[in-house]
Amino acid sequence: MKLQKPKGTQDILPGDAAKWQYVESVARDTFSQYNYGEIRTPMFEHYEVISRSVGDTTDIVTKEMYDFYDKGDRHITLRPEGTAPVVRSYVENKLFAPEVQKPVKLYYIGSMFRYERPQAGRLREFHQIGVECFGAANPATDVETIAMAYHLFEKLGIKDVTLHLNSLGSPESRAAYRQALIDYLTPMRDQLSKDSQRRLDENPLRVLDSKEKEDKLAVEKAPSILDYLDEESQAHFEAVKDMLEALDIPYVIDTNMVRGLDYYNHTIFEFITSVEGSDLTICAGGRYDSLVGYFGGPETPGFGFGLGLERLLMVIEKQGITLPIETEMDVYLAVLGDGANSKALELVQAIRRQGFTAERDYLGRKIKAQFKSADTFKAKLVMTLGESEVEAGKAVIKNNRSRQEVEVSFEDMMTNFANISEQLLS
């Protein structure tokens, strides 16, 4: 049997991993500018953590969860999204306590799991960057969080990003709109897809989110949720729009956007970009003011977003964005003969401990093959170490581009490599 990775997963090899690390690093730096701290939650949770918060009728719970019973007969699921686990942690660890500074700002980076049909930018194990902000109902929190995502995309050089915005209002507004949508869709029930016929009974707002052609046609003239917002919800949404304009962040109103998770209220948003003529959602989120209370904590407003790393990296590649990844090596040691083996290890380790990237030959190859490796590694400096150099206690180091070279004692290499490097590279 040929052993291969499971369908819908990937091996991220070193060349690609460098791009991942860069994007993650830019995200961490950006979030720290906004006073966010990292949280790491388990990759698996009790099934109820996800099913009861995300929604029993959502596609995630009914079709996509990787759930199982463990050896203690506990119902467990691999996490399909990041918000519910973070909210569970917020409540379990009492981050709502008075002594904890509010708002509590958290970010996470990690694997999520959904049983979906694998396609470009969508895998069964995928990686998500997300943020959650707890404790502030102020619409400025909505805008700051949206602006943080926008800031991240600017730093990464992503082009043609459009903010799509909607409001789901308060629970009361949503209930009124739900009934209006049922009244509108029921006469055309037979024209809907099978999934949307089920959604009409269980969660009619999800019909608006359907990608099926017949459903899109049916909801074209559906009533707008914005017409059902109560006074408080209208004021919140107007404040969000005003502050986005104050920050020069353009947006479009999309009244058919509802998001695929049941816990949202008030502001919801998506960032969409164009790739090869197709629109792709690269970030999505919104406000969820009842979720902390649902998990047994005090009523606490929340706002957050998630973005898929695979999709983000695909956009970066398709838009021709070159990431400034350092690929050069500082020094390569070519080793000739068994008598130089031990000293080569000693020297390369001393150079690394001074903060330089270094590699040496371990395969006993001919000098030409070793120099070729130095070129492959893009080594700035190359040193050749043989038994005669070991006896003399010194060796020649050369600039691999200019071919300028200098003879240096082992003692200087082991204690003062910065000066040697500066002399050859300046």
Curated annotation (Swiss-Prot):
Statement: the UniProt record of this protein carries the keyword Nucleotide-binding: yes
Transmembrane segments: none
Catalytic function, reaction form: tRNA(His) + L-histidine + ATP = L-histidyl-tRNA(His) + AMP + diphosphate + H(+)
Cellular-component GO terms for this entry: cytoplasm
Keyword field: Aminoacyl-tRNA synthetase, ATP-binding, Cytoplasm, Ligase, Nucleotide-binding, Protein biosynthesis
Keyword ATP-binding recorded: yes
Cystine crosslinks: none
InterPro entries, alphabetized: aa-tRNA-synth_II (IPR006195), aa-tRNA-synth_II/BPL/LPL (IPR045864), Anticodon-bd (IPR004154), Anticodon-bd_dom_sf (IPR036621), His-tRNA-ligase (IPR015807), HisRS-like_core (IPR041715), HisRS/HisZ (IPR004516), HisRS_anticodon (IPR033656)
GO terms for MF: ATP binding; catalytic activity, acting on a protein; histidine-tRNA ligase activity; transferase activity
Places the protein is found: Cytoplasm
Annotated GO biological process: histidyl-tRNA aminoacylation
EC number: 6.1.1.21
Top enzyme class: ligase
HAMAP family: His_tRNA_synth
Family stated for the protein in its record: Belongs to the class-II aminoacyl-tRNA synthetase family.
Subunit structure: Homodimer.
Protein name: Histidine--tRNA ligase
Organism: Streptococcus pyogenes serotype M6 (strain ATCC BAA-946 / MGAS10394)
Gene: hisS
